Structure formats: structure tokens, C-alpha cells
Amino acid sequence: HVRYTNKNWFIAAKSVLGSNLTQTSMLGGYGVKAIDKLTGEQEYASILNSSSWLNVVYGQKWKPGIFLGYTKNLGTGDAVTKLYGTGTDVDQVVMAGAELTYNVAHWKFGLEYTLSSAWYGSMDASNGKIKDTHSVCNNRIVGVAMFMF
């Protein structure tokens, strides 16, 4: 995580690489890679995910800003039969947003537009990666009036 601020600029970025990141409210999970036929005991392989984002805001009274984000499912690295978790059929997600806020003492008024696109597909059992993807897009507009004390 990096962050830079001064009188006019706010710049922040973060990148995460991890396995089974569902406990951090991110995409991820695990897959069953082996089942002992005698005891029924299962072996698991975690889904590896990478996620990065960048946020840049400029100004004092009027503050335009942009947000860019990307998440990628890197698979399990092992052959798996079934996946458990959050968004296990998502290959990648791209997010881009623009915002404009007006800031005065104790008040913030703003408008934000965000476009998100997720590529869904089916699991490749040889490595837990997602194949045969198609994208779904979401448009979001948010308005805010915030009193700060």
C-alpha cells in the first residue's frame, strides 16, 4: 500500500496477492483436489487471486478524482473437482470511476460514476482457472451530501 498527500493531491494505490481471500471480502476460495476413498478425507487447493487499485484526487474546494481497479483469478495450480468460495466462476474484474466533489467547511457534496465489468466463465478442472468467459457490465451513479463534524 502506498499513499501520497499534500495540499492539493491525494494519491493511493494497493496491490494484494493471496490465496482464499474470502475472509477479506474479496474473491477467492478453495477447490477439492483429492478425496481419500477409504476415509473420505479431502485435500484442498486454494484459489490464488491478485487485486490492484489506484485512486487519484486533486484540489481543495472542487476535487475531481479517478479510481481504477483490477482483480484476476490466477487459479489453484492443481487439478480440482469442485470449487467453494466467493466468485469462484469470475476470471477477472475491471473497475473505472470518476468523481467530483465540492468541499466547504463541514460539508461535502459529490457525484460519482463507476463502470465495472466482470468476466464469468466455467472452471478448467486441470488448474482451477476460468475459461470460456463472457463479460457483464454494471453502471453506477452515486450522489452524496455529507455533513462532517
Predicted regions: what is each one?
Residues V2-Y4, S52-Y58, A98-Y102, L111-Y113, ...:
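Residues on the lipid-exposed face of transmembrane beta-strands in outer-membrane beta-barrel proteins
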